Amino acid sequence: MWRVKDSIQESLLGIAELGLSKVVFRRVESQIDEPEESGVPESTVAEPAQVVSFSENGLRFMADITGGQKTGFFLDQRVNRQKVSEVSRGKHVLNAFCYTGAFSVYAFAGGAESVTSVDASKSAIDLCRQNVVANFASAPHNAEVADCFSYLTQIPDTFDVIVLDPPAFAKHQRAVQRAMRGYETINALALKKIKPGGTLATFSCSQLISREMFRDAIMRAAVSAGRFVRIVDFLHQAPCHPTSIFHPEGDYLKGLMLFVE
């Protein structure tokens, strides 16, 4: 795709309905090649703007498209955000690894009683606060800069709904076993903080972690936490991120919606 990026840019800018004034290309680090070995620059930007505003399903968001993670906003979670919204009415919600707070905004859109957003990045939390205020100015929103593992270990609070959407734990094959331990640990911590009858929406975006591996990690987490858990939905990347049948690794985003007793 990088070889034809100029053609892609020309085509996108030529679609009047999109109203684009610029195209930003970001090189995603590979599981195989290191950047210096690939001969491809880390990023190429056409007249970059740092923060852009846009809407998704009628909700307003801001994203840092040059300094943020990946493209600055995770469009692949669009459908899953709506599903979290649908279980949030009247609930106290924790959005862990919240990044810029898209799940938090959707939780309020679904009628959440309160939302707590936690991320280790201060710049992400700053945008998270702005995104919530842009849609629900007076909403009871608590945003904290913290390591999510430590936060879940230390807080006394419990929640009706918890969203776990961490960054990739395994970017290389040698990190898979450590990643599996990480998924088990963070999900066990979350399960201990969910009220009986609550919901956990948990994700892995590591393409090296299969759906079966992720499900096994969650099963072990449930045993460790001493919670009885039922799968109510299998979550995937949005249809705007189709997967070639010849490239199963493209089915990278996997998630579970769990009912926790």
Task: Tell me the role of every PLM-derived stretch.
Residues 199-261:
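C-terminal catalytic and target-recognition region of SAM-dependent MTase-like enzymes
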